């Protein structure tokens, strides 16, 4: 193994000369470089357009949320107004409920009295028929 290392270190291999590029190959390489450059340029332009679209969508969404916030604030204000009106009407609504309950009880009492009157009329009719 020492022999191999000695040979490798003592002699240097000849450096091959690089052949001059053939004009056709040079033209193909330049063409490829141009096409790759155009490809990357279009990729970058596409990415930039996508970012611009995302930015526009983001701004539109942000504006939509601002608009929705304004609408929600208006609805909340109107709801507060309606709640205040309801609170002002609550005593009257309680009176209406009380009158409704009284009316229901009067209707029940009327039904009982009508049954009683019907029974009395039937008894009176029976008594009159027996006396004849």
Curated annotation (Swiss-Prot):
Residues 1-24 are annotated as: Disordered. GO terms for molecular function: gamma-tubulin binding. One of its GO terms (biological process) is positive regulation of gut granule assembly. Residues 13-22 have a biased composition (Pro residues). InterPro entries: BLOC1_su2. GO terms for cellular component: BLOC complex; BLOC-1 complex; BORC complex; gamma-tubulin complex. It comes from the Eukaryota. PANTHER family: BIOGENESIS OF LYSOSOME-RELATED ORGANELLES COMPLEX 1 SUBUNIT 2 (PTHR46479:SF1). Component of the biogenesis of lysosome-related organelles complex-1 (BLOC-1) composed at least of blos-1, blos-2, blos-4, dsbn-1, glo-2, mutd-1 and snpn-1. Belongs to the BLOC1S2 family. Component of the biogenesis of lysosome-related organelles complex-1 (BLOC-1) involved in gut granule biogenesis. This is Biogenesis of lysosome-related organelles complex 1 subunit 2. It comes from Caenorhabditis elegans.
